[in-house]
């Protein structure tokens, strides 16, 4: 939310979550779970959170695409993201649920933007014209793989030892 709230390319028009948070102001839904150094952005703090499942028709009618980052079981996430795609709404997912789905591209744009070429195959499976799901890589990978990629291309990297320490975000 903090990265998108004042971004020049995006306008947050809807926020959705589980039925537990639906109907609440975003500020109230987040409550004490807000862990950022900054305050909840003014643009979104008073927005009413919608039910991501029950309000799918309304949400997909109002948005161009969805950024999905939900705390649910993997099978529930898969179902939810596929429903949005089937409603002809592109989904860019932060979740791991579809990272091993063969026709869902895991995109690190600087490295493998061409992986989006699999989307027509996914659309055929889902029966969609516009809707699709694309996922981002694990947060750890996206920090060091862009630096390793050109080194591998130039010199051939055989082994890498990586240590990660999880942040509050998971």
Task: Report the location of each language-model feature.
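N-terminal Rossmann-like NAD(P) cofactor-binding subdomain of oxidoreductases
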Residues: 1-170
């Amino acid at each position: 939310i903090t990265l998108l709230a004042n971004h020049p390319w995006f306008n947050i028009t809807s926020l959705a979550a589980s039925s537990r948070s639906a109907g609440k102001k975003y500020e109230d839904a987040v409550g004490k779970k807000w862990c950022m150094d900054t305050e909840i952005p003014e643009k979104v703090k008073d927005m009413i959170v919608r039910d991501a499942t029950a309000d799918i028709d309304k949400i997909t009618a109002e948005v161009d695409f969805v950024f999905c980052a939900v705390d649910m079981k993997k099978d529930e996430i898969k179902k939810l993201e596929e429903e949005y795609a089937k409603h002809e709404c592109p989904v860019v997912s932060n979740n791991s649920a579809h990272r091993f789905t063969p026709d869902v591209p895991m995109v690190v744009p600087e490295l493998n933007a061409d992986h989006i070429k699999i989307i027509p195959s996914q659309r055929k499976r889902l029966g969609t014209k516009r809707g699709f799901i694309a996922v981002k890589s694990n947060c750890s990978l996206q920090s060091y793989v862009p630096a390793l990629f050109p080194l591998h291309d130039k010199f051939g990297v055989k082994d890498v030892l990586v240590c990660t320490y999880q942040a509050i975000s998971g």
